[in-house]
């Protein structure tokens, strides 16, 4: 979306925020700094009550702990590697920018917000369901707001969570990332399917060598005698482009079909960028960013740092191994507990946030 759309969304968000702010006492909205808000609701509590009665979630949560630790370990290595490459100049600074700064330019507003809400809502709902299965009270749920824009959702657990066994806390903490990973995996076939949806493909950007013949707004009709009906058709064609080869392209312009013969560049490119119709683009972009946000939210939350889920998951791992009947595994758990405990994880927390914040600040310098 262009800058004008971003301005419209911002204006609408501010108007909504002014209305919410004026009635904040009656709707149980707590505000911070005049721009942030926490809106506590009962939204989702019935679903949590209904699904949380099944004890199967307890077993799934316990099994998820070692899986989440492994994924979190690789995420930690990736964060450190990215920071080193960022400082050495082998990674562009844009790669370290926070997601919020990418909205409007890289991430389309509407699909991006929908995808982010799906990721965070599923994440928090899973925490609530797993907590309920362990008999821990879910006090409330709610929405986090920045001006009038929803940043995400949350569930507020009872005080029993703080005093619960490490293993239980780890199982509940693993629920959110696990739910995000499931949505991530589910979105893969959906994304593949979305590329096959029948749609017109409009040229949104054109460069050499195609710019001599084609214009923005032209609709791709046919390439080398093959009708282009979907993004998948165009992607498959793009894979076959060879350097310095002639391609016959038919386009629709002003209700007329025009035919051009274009020779590809030395790099094997035609210089055409296309986009599907608005409704199809909205669907594809929503699935695409749902895919990415769930993947990133899952792995980021598994870092061994407070207040992320990974802190409780990692803290529970040695305890889980110690309780195994196998003497060797139990001994490994005892040894790991010397290195993975609340004290060492507190130090790792400082390291993780210093690396992340340092990388972000460096990328904006």
Swiss-Prot record:
GO terms for molecular function: metalloendopeptidase activity. Its main location: membrane. The chain crosses the membrane at residues 3-23, 60-80, 100-120, 141-161, 171-191, 280-300. Keywords: Cell membrane, Membrane, Transmembrane, Transmembrane helix. GO terms for biological process: membrane protein intracellular domain proteolysis. It is found in: Cell membrane. GO terms for cellular component: cytoplasm; plasma membrane. It is a multi-pass membrane protein. It comes from the Archaea. InterPro entries: MBTPS2 (IPR001193), PDZ (IPR001478), PDZ_sf (IPR036034), Peptidase_M50 (IPR008915). To S.solfataricus C04034. This is Uncharacterized protein MJ0971. It comes from Methanocaldococcus jannaschii (strain ATCC 43067 / DSM 2661 / JAL-1 / JCM 10045 / NBRC 100440) (Methanococcus jannaschii).
């Amino acid at each position: 979306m262009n800058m004008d759309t971003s301005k419209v969304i911002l204006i609408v968000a501010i108007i909504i925020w002014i209305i919410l702010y004026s009635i904040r006492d009656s709707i149980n909205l707590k505000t911070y700094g005049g721009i942030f808000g926490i809106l506590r609701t009962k939204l989702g509590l019935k679903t949590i009550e209904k699904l949380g009665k099944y004890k199967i979630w307890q077993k799934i949560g316990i099994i998820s702990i070692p899986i989440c630790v492994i994924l979190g370990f690789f995420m930690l290595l990736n964060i450190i590697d990215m920071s080193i490459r960022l400082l050495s100049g082998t990674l562009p600074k844009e790669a370290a920018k926070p997601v919020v700064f990418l909205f409007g330019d890289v991430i389309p507003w509407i699909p991006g917000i929908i995808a982010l809400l799906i990721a965070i809502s599923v994440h928090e709902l899973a925490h609530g369901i797993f907590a309920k299965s362990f008999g821990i009270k879910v006090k409330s749920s709610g929405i986090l707001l920045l001006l009038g824009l929803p940043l995400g959702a949350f569930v507020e657990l009872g005080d029993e969570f703080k005093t619960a066994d490490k293993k239980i806390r780890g199982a509940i903490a693993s629920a959110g990332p696990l739910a995000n990973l499931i949505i991530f995996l589910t979105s893969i076939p959906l994304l593949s399917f979305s590329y096959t949806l029948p749609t017109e493909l409009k040229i949104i950007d054109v460069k050499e060598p195609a710019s001599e013949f084609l214009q923005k707004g032209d609709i791709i009709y046919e390439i080398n005698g093959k009708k282009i009906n979907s993004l998948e058709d165009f992607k498959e064609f793009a894979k076959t482009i060879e350097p310095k080869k002639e391609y016959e392209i038919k386009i629709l312009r002003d209700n007329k079909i025009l035919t051009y013969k274009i020779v590809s560049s030395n790099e094997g490119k035609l210089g055409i960028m296309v986009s599907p119709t608005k409704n199809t683009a909205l669907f594809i972009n929503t699935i695409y960013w749902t895919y990415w946000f769930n993947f990133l939210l899952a792995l980021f939350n598994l870092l061994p740092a407070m207040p992320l889920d990974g802190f409780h998951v990692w803290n529970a791992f040695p305890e889980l191994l110690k309780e195994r009947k196998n003497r060797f595994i139990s001994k490994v758990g005892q040894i790991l507990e010397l290195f993975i405990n609340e004290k060492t994880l507190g130090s790792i927390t400082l390291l993780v946030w210093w690396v992340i914040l340092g990388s972000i600040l460096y990328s904006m310098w």
